[in-house]
Structures are given as C-alpha cells and as structure tokens.
Amino acid sequence: MKVTLPDFRRAGVLVVGDVMLDRYWYGPTSRISPEAPVPVVKVDTIEERPGGAANVAMNIASLGAVARLVGLTGIDDAARALICKLSEVRVRCDFVSVPTHPTITKLRVLSRNQQLIRLDFEEGFDGVDPTPIFERIQLALPQIGALVLSDYAKGALNSVQPMIQLARKANVPVLIDPKGSDFERYRGATLLTPNLSEFEAVVGRCKNEEELVNRGMQLVADFELSALLVTRSEQGMTLLQLGKPPLHLPTQAKEVFDVTGAGDTVIGVLAAALAAGNSLEESCFLANAAAGVVVGKLGTSTVSPIELENAIRGRAETGFGVMDEQQLKIAVAQARQRGEKVVMTNGIFDILHAGHVSYLANARKLGDRLIVAVNSDASTKRLKGEKRPVNPLEQRMVVLGALEAVDWVVPFEEDTPQRLIADILPDLLVKGGDYKPHEIAGSEEVWAAGGEVKVLNFEDGVSTTNIIQSIKNGRG
C-alpha cells in the first residue's frame, strides 16, 4: 500500500477518556538494601509525562493536528502538571475537576533502562456525574473530524453510549480503545482497537488466522460496528470490515524497548489521519508505522511527522536519514534514552568512493548510531575552491543517508562543525586522516562532556581529489 502523509494541520480530534500522569524516576543501582532484598536506586532524574487519554492527545498534537482533551482530574499537583505539560504541546484541555478524587498517577522506577517497580495512585471516578462530559462533547463536535474514546476503566467512560450517539448523530466517526470484555457498551462505534488479549477475552482463544477473522467479523456484526482493528504485537495488526477482505499489516518494529502507550499511539495517529481525509485503510497503515516507531522508545512517547515519514519510507525506529539540527537533537535524545552510544563524524563527501564507505562502516562499528555532518555548498567552496563541490549538498546527503552504516545526516554552514558538535555532544567523535585528536574540531567540547575522540585511517590512495584528476586526465 502506497500512502503519503496528509496535512495533519487541517485535522481536529477530540479525545475523551481516562487521563493520568506518568511519573518516571531514573537512577543507577549499585547495591542491595540492608532493609530488604531489593536494589537501592539513587534517583538522579525525574520526568513527568501525560498518560492514558492524555497520551493519545499528545500523539495527535505531535503530528500537527488540533487536539482537544476532555477527562476527569482531581484538584491537585498532578492535575496542574498535566495541564502544564499538555499546554506545552498545544493540547486544548477541558478537564472536569472532581475535588473529592485525586488525579490518577502512575510512578515508575527505572534503572539501566529496566523498570523495577510501578506504583499506582488512584481511586477511580466511579459514580461521578457524566453530564459535564456530555456537554463538552456536544460543544466540540462541530469543530472536529473524529472522536476518540480512550477507556482505561477508571470511570470517565462509564456512560459511553450517550457519547457514541452524540457523535454518530453529528456524522463524526467514533474510535474506541476498549477495556474489559463487555463490548456491548461500545455498540454502534465506528471502530474498536482491542489488542489480541482483549479481543480473545471477548471471542475466546483463536487457534489460527481463519478463526480470528471469522470471530472478528461476527463481533463487528453483533455490535453494529463499522470496523474492528485487532493489534497483535509482533504479528502486526488486522483490520476487519463486513463485505471486505481482511487487511493484515505486518509489524514495522525493528527493536522493541517499551510497549507503554503503543495503543495510544495507534488510535491517536489513526484518528488524526481519518480526520485529515485519509481512508480507514490508509489510516491503519500510518498507525501501524507509528507503532513500529514508538515501541523503540522508552516510556509513553509520541511520533513526529518526520519519524512517521521515515517509517513509511521503510526506515522506522527513531527517524533516520537526512535531518535538520532540531530533528537530529530529538533523535539523539531518544537514542540516549535507550542507552545507545552515538558516534559522530563530518566531511564534504563530494564524490562518495570506497574509502569513504569503508571509513563510515568502521566508524559505525564503534557505537550504535552514526551521525554524518556534511559541509554545505558554500562551506565547501570556501574550503576547496569555486569548482567544488561537484555534487550539490542535497545529492551528497541523500547518497550518504542511503548507506547502511549511516543513521543520520545533517548539514552545517560553517567551515568546521565545531558549533554543531558542541550542541550534539556525541559519545564518540571520529575523524579520518592524519589528524591528532586535539586538532579535530569539537574535540575539546566532547572531552569536556566526558566523551571520546578517535582518529581512523582512510583507505590509501583513494580520494575525491584524485578521482576528479583522473577524470580530467581521461578526458584529456
């Protein structure tokens, strides 16, 4: 299926559901507590991220779409933290504050990229009057192209049928991430997105693909759904619609670090794509690609348009290929969250030859990700003369980005990449040739940050200058 990204800026989506705050405490562990046989974590980093329905809204906003969020919170620090974090990414919050209940909060303690324990702070919102939520939905319907109901069984969606009816009356598609085995509650929805275990809790264990499809189709008919999307972890996802053959989308995940919030990403991207004008099949394709990206990150995460674009071009995970500096910083930060070692090198790379390819492959072996910073055309002319470069910057970067050894390619305008290196601060700075480490641009900054600097040899007798001269001699 060939799919291009829509203009997400024209999409408006309302998310209604169980909002929560995800807290993360990070730190090293080096000993066992004398009080009990448990590790001692010396916490050095604390993060707060919107979770649950709030993470769905974050995923929608990260694509550039207009995201509105309705949910139940307490009147406490967690609610204020949620509003602050969501406003930073332009999610429009319209929470119903319940003074008698705390905002749902989940605290995770992690060390060396491993989750050690999760602590939940919640009472749920059962018994809370849903009328204010109905009123907020009614007001938002004229301005949205899709309604997402994100159900974590915490109380915000206890009265879900009136919400479905309001949306269907306004001809707005209703997408639901369900919870529990009572799918009767979701009758008449446009689409349900259960994972495989949630699906089998309703229809029973499926022995094979045929059984899954048949039982899924029956579920669509029984509950008057327009479609059902079953997310199946490493087996991808399957879209079922009456009167149409099943659409199976294989997983695009290359590495799985954390599945936290992956379902939020799927329904968020799917809703944004539908609201932007994509078909259901195209929207599922994009959601599947986004899921392949987000499981390669640690914790509840979102997907940017550049990451999604790279994923549907076949380069998933954190986003690969040619990037600007801001995109590169995001990609590097995500790589570091996963504990990956980042290597960086630079050059003109005017006519890519065997020496370049060998050098870049050797540089990549020294870490997990390789950044190649490339001199702009103006920078190259200043260094090499008016007749250079032979190949313009765009072509040089595309060729470099196609190499298996290269993860990220970024241009720079200055004569040296010192400023860029100081901004990125790679774990290892590499340069080819006869340099001494202290002569390499950016070496002082990398050392000061605790990184390494290394010189690699180029293949003897192979250079761009020699190739150009040989071409000239051949023409002579």
Curated annotation (Swiss-Prot):
EC number: 2.7.1.167, 2.7.7.70
Record's keyword terms, sorted: ATP-binding, Carbohydrate metabolism, Kinase, Multifunctional enzyme, Nucleotide-binding, Nucleotidyltransferase, Transferase
Pathway(s) it belongs to: Nucleotide-sugar biosynthesis; ADP-L-glycero-beta-D-manno-heptose biosynthesis; ADP-L-glycero-beta-D-manno-heptose from D-glycero-beta-D-manno-heptose 7-phosphate: step 1/4; Nucleotide-sugar biosynthesis; ADP-L-glycero-beta-D-manno-heptose biosynthesis; ADP-L-glycero-beta-D-manno-heptose from D-glycero-beta-D-manno-heptose 7-phosphate: step 3/4
InterPro entries referenced in this protein's UniProt entry, alphabetically: Bifunc_HldE (IPR023030), Carboh/pur_kinase_PfkB_CS (IPR002173), Cyt_trans-like (IPR004821), PfkB_dom (IPR011611), RfaE_dom_I (IPR011913), RfaE_dom_II (IPR011914), Ribokinase-like (IPR029056), Rossmann-like_a/b/a_fold (IPR014729)
A GO biological process held by the record: ADP-L-glycero-beta-D-manno-heptose biosynthetic process
Species per Swiss-Prot/TrEMBL record: Yersinia pseudotuberculosis serotype O:1b (strain IP 31758)
Similarity comment text for this entry: In the N-terminal section; belongs to the carbohydrate kinase PfkB family. In the C-terminal section; belongs to the cytidylyltransferase family.
Region of interest (Ribokinase), ranges: 1-318
A Pfam family per the record: PfkB
Region feature (Cytidylyltransferase): 344-476
Any GO CC annotation of this UniProt entry: cytosol
Binding site for ATP: N195, L196, S197, E198
Catalytic residues identified in the record: D264
PANTHER family: BIFUNCTIONAL PROTEIN HLDE
Subunit and interaction comment: Homodimer.
Catalytic reaction equation(s): D-glycero-beta-D-manno-heptose 7-phosphate + ATP = D-glycero-beta-D-manno-heptose 1,7-bisphosphate + ADP + H(+); D-glycero-beta-D-manno-heptose 1-phosphate + ATP + H(+) = ADP-D-glycero-beta-D-manno-heptose + diphosphate
Keyword Metal-binding: no
Gene that this sequence comes from: hldE
Function field: Catalyzes the ADP transfer from ATP to D-glycero-beta-D-manno-heptose 1-phosphate, yielding ADP-D-glycero-beta-D-manno-heptose.
Name of the protein described by the UniProt record: Bifunctional protein HldE
A single GO molecular function term of this UniProt record: ATP binding
